[in-house]
Amino acid sequence: LSVRLLRYSYSKLCNLYFVYELSRRLRAEGSGLSVAAFNPGLMTETAFATTSPPVGAVMRRLFASRLGNLAASGMALADLAAGRGAFPIDGLYFDRTAASASASSALSYDESNARDLWLLSEKLTGVAL
């Protein structure tokens, strides 16, 4: 994999760590707030799909069933945020193409990694939540 793709993948993993850790912390405080992770899917308008025409063409062929657009992904996110599903959302991962919560990667559920990232983020930003 290219360095750019690895960085992108790690950034998505860190997003999941953040959501799962935030969910745990909010539950522990009894805040009553819910947080969820949402994957908008591969979108035709993103730089990933438009930067390189040959890469975009291959991606469209390989992932045609997963391709969407901003409007479809936005509607799926709005439905989730508005609570239009008949299920709880807190601490879960949702994919635009799925009718319910999905499992994220096994690594994304590593609570130690999530906690370490949270603490490092607090240290680097000077912001504690």
Explain the meaning of each model-derived region:
Residues 1-129:
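NAD(P)H-dependent oxidoreductase Rossmann-fold/reductase module
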